[in-house]
Amino acid sequence: MSTVESREVRPARERWEVALPDGRVVPWTGFQVGPAGIAPHELAHICRRLLGLGPAEAEAAAREELSPAGAARDRPGIVAYSPPMAKRMFEGALESLAAGEPAEDWPTILEARSVCLAHEGDLLIGRTAPWKEAAAGRPVVEVPDHDHFHLSHALLRLADGPADRWSRVLGPAIDRLRADPACVVRVYALDEPMRILLLWLKRVAGVDRLLVEANAPEITEKWGHKAVLHPAARAAHDLPAPPGRAPFDVLDAETELTPLYRVFGLAVPRLPGYTVVWDGEPADAVTDGGIRTTPGDPVRVPVTPGDEPLGNGRARRAEDSFAAQLVLAAQLLRGRHGVRLGCLKPVRGGTGQRIHVGVPLDDPDVLAALARQAARSGEDYLLEAHADYLRHAVTGHEFLLAPSVHVRAGALADGMALQFLNGTMWEGNVFLDESTHAAFGIARSHYARIRHAMADFVRLFEGRGLINGGVDFAIARVGGRYDDTTLVAMQDLNLSACGADYLHAFLEESRTVLGALAGTGTGISAATKVIRPASDMDLPRLRRLVDHRTPTSYARALTSVPGNWGLIAVACPDAVRAAEEVLALEARLTA
């Protein structure tokens, strides 16, 4: 089981500590919430107590009673953003602490920045100080639980407690649903804890169906990850590939083995790559049977990758299989595609963590070490050809041409977003469209191909519960048998709420604020940028330094989690100017 799922809960004290397998005890620092979680067996008990249903029955009920829907601006809804289980944000936090590195406080970040997406009159649910600052002056529900990493777990604990307590805290949300059964609840992702919570909330409110701005669970869980773009290494190995066959013919043949093609007949542009499947159960990757999250009785964290052997024979067999598949994937990339370097990444990672670039595919020692490390997480991985992205520089930044295209309220969003990247980590976006993509070095043919591929993808899932999300693309070379050919390829499916949502929301706001300019026919572009605010840089202070408006530009501080994470934005008529101004603003703030 995943680390977040295997945690036990105890009453909170003043601080938490994490006991690492090597004997070190480190403080759970840099977070405004604790590391507590709900174990799977207890989640099942809570599900039965709240709903009278087992987990499988609750999943079936959610398909009937929770309806994916886009939120309308003229109808106040409810906003409750919790870290999605599939993104493994808790696991990423543990890895950072184990390595002695600062960790991003994703629960607080998601709560605080969700306010940027709120419509007029939306009821906001959260618990942290940055969220309260962002939500000032808006209707709110403040959750009195800072122990649990996931807001959804904190809310389930509340719901499973005394009725007089949950009715007092959640009364405004229940009253809103009763007053307007068509009210839309907006969540980051409709994962299992959130499904159970919303089914319970629906029953308490007495409404027939609950509208939820999130993808249907099958969309996010079955199709919202990298593995759907690539064949499994073992399946690809069985594909005849005669020597001398043209590389693009090989790539096309392998594309027919991908889940998207096998189920829907959709061939998407992709880089050479293969999935490496974890054959064991997720629990086989965890040496310790449980993780304690009691303050003063330190949290037990799974073994640092590669430090200790796995704890049972089944796990050892799964690890051996994983390592063999990784070697096979490397051999296929070298033999069929002539590629010498690879990129190893978890198929469900969503924050740019745990990605290894420039992997030498002919080095067995490196492959073995990476296999041991990756296998510890008990999840599937992807070994893809290393992408040498085309690049374009503006003042203050060199962009990798790795644009993303998005779905909003079930429809293909305008344009595309070019990403600010720090290594493999997302740090903001610039909005590009037909009139501005060339200024960032994106050829018209590449822009058109990306938009066409995304339109096909959205059309495929029309009516299946696709409400929001984004797809990351690469405009890159991989070398080998492809020589200097530039490939345009889908690389990642983020079928849930995502960072570019804030770019699109700010762009809509900017078009209203700069309405006189837009009325002249002048286009408006925008850029968002992640910053690292000082420990005393709360949102009111950041706004005093950032917010300004002129007839041709608009800047605003969107989020601040002091000492951890912030988001600023700039809008103006020119995309390059928007990017350069947001970078200059970041530089002034951090000088």
Residue spans for each PLM region:
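A short beta-strand motif that forms the metal-chelation/ATP-contact edge
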Residues: V405, Y482-L495
